[in-house]
Amino acid sequence: MANNPGAKKAIRKIARRTEVNTARRSRVRTFLRKFEDALAAGDAAVAKAAFIEAQSELMRAVSKGVVHPNTGSRKVSRLAARLKKLDQAAA
C-alpha cells in the first residue's frame, strides 16, 4: 500500500494512463478488424482505405508508447503485404 503522497499520486496517474492506453489499444484492434473484414470481402478499394486508417492508428499508438515501434512496423508491413496480394489477385 502506498504510504506517502507521491506514491499515492503515482497510483492515480497509472490508473488514468492504463485507461487511456487500453482505449488506444482497443481502437487499434478495431481498425485492424475493419481491414481484415475488407480483405475477407475482397474489395480492394475498401481494403486500401481501411489499410490507410489502420496504418495511421497503429503509428499513432507507436508514437504514444502503447505499441513498441518494431511491433507497429511489423504489423503495418504485414498488412501492406496482404493488401498487395489482394491487389495482384484482383488485377
Curated annotation (Swiss-Prot):
Q: Which UniProt keywords apply?
A: Ribonucleoprotein, Ribosomal protein, RNA-binding, rRNA-binding
One GO BP on record is: translation
Q: Does the keyword Ribosomal protein apply?
A: yes
What does the record give as the function of this protein?
Binds directly to 16S ribosomal RNA.
List GO molecular-function terms, semicolon-separated: small ribosomal subunit rRNA binding; structural constituent of ribosome
- Which gene is annotated as encoding this protein in its UniProt record? rpsT
Instruction: Give the UniProt family note.
Output: Belongs to the bacterial ribosomal protein bS20 family.
This protein is called: Small ribosomal subunit protein bS20
Which species does the entry assign this protein to?
Caulobacter sp. (strain K31)
Give the CC-aspect GO terms.
cytosol; small ribosomal subunit
Ribosomal protein among keywords: yes
PANTHER family linked:
30S RIBOSOMAL PROTEIN S20 (PTHR33398), SMALL RIBOSOMAL SUBUNIT PROTEIN BS20C (PTHR33398:SF1)
Q: Which InterPro entries match?
A: Ribosomal_bS20, Ribosomal_bS20_sf
Q: Classify the source by domain of life.
A: Bacteria
- Report the SUPFAM superfamilies cross-referenced here: Ribosomal protein S20 (SSF46992)
Q: Where are the annotated coiled coils located?
A: none
